[in-house]
């Protein structure tokens, strides 16, 4: 059983016989993480939808939009290792997720989310 189905995949090195173009409509995962052997690790995973972004004289450009609207658990992050840009990206995603689920939340849940799931 393999939870990762092709043909698309992003790797530092192409696998012979597994080359595939990424096209609009494809869904792929973004799984950044770090593991300390024999100790601990963390990984945040999101599903991303490939969509057309813009077209100009240089070609057609695509982008990825998250389609997983689950906030990251920031308590597992050591903020000392994150740049300001990385913190801003995490907070941007937290807001994106909130905007997609807020109508299903009670006011108490909204308040908790806004007070606990952003890096200050």
Where are these regions (language model features)?
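Charged, cofactor-coupling segments
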Residues: 4-120
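C-terminal active-site-proximal or functional interface alpha/beta core segments in diverse enzymes
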Residues: 1
